[in-house]
Amino acid sequence: MVLDELAALGRGGQIAGTSRLSGGEIADVWLITYADGTQVIAKTVTGAAPDLFAVEADGLAALRGTGYLATPQVLAVTERLLLLEALAPLGDSEQSWERFARDLAAAHRSTAGDRFGWPRDGYLGRLRQVNTWTTSGHQFFAEHRLLRYLSEPAAEQVLTAADRRAVERLCARLPEIIPDMPAVLTHGDLWTGNLVSQPGGRITVIDPAVARTWAEVDLSMLWSNPRPPASGRFFAAYQELNPSPPGWAGRMPILHLREHLSVIAHFGAEAPSTLNLTREILAPFYPR
């Protein structure tokens, strides 16, 4: 498929090799090497929304437009193919992570405002991410980042009535748990699988799910997922430059619940460990 899509773009000639890369649970990701040594990344997808890659390209442009975050150059975009500049895998140096903290903190600070949402809906995986504008961060996160996944068929199959009620109780208490914070431009899916490196080692973001919401949403993805040892410097450096309200580390699991519910909504019973983690986070909110 990838060769057919490249040929349709006039980029199918003199290809020396194709290599399928790891990751990419939604799209297939390929490293394309041409005879002259040039390399590009090609993402292909079938059966997804026709604007999936266009939304991704727009998100990369928005992040790059802050003037602080590095993104790969978008070379071409169609309904079934996204062609990107090829970059190196994520490195693991304290200097790179500290610079990334500066980049992300500056991007968050420079985009702060009071409206939550985005001009268009996006995607987290294959599922639509609703970005309807609101001035309430608690309402935005409750309605569009937590409750919206409960009605997905895969989630309905595995979440019990008690699970659903616990999510609803958590949403009702969000104003007690999450302090008022401004809306900033967030990457939206900022785990290490969506980070690569430029030749000089600068950390570069890929695969965004952008929206204007709390900065801590981005932090929660990095905090709650496995990460390289050198990344420990990231959190200290970020807090020096863009301090979160006190108790930020304790809020990370709550904010990361959005990711767990998304995984359940995509994979249902095929993600038992995620279901267990979700219930651990929700434990204080089950009826007693």
PLM features per residue range, with description:
Residues 1-8, 112-186, 198:
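An alpha-helical support segment within catalytic cores of ATP-dependent transferases
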Residues 12-19:
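Conserved N-terminal boundary motif of the eukaryotic protein kinase catalytic domain
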Residues 19-139:
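ATP-binding pocket architecture of kinase catalytic cores
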Residues 53, 97-100, 163-167, 274-278:
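Hydrophobic packing residues in well-ordered alpha-helices of helical domains and bundles
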Residues 67, 108-115, 153, 178, ...:
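A general structural signal marking secondary-structure boundaries and capping sites
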Residues 83-85, 258-265:
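Conserved PLP-binding active-site segment of the aspartate aminotransferase-like
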Residues 137-142, 151, 181-185, 192-253, ...:
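Active-site Asp-x-Gly
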Residues 233, 263-288:
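ATP/Mg2+ or Mg2+-diphosphate-binding catalytic cores
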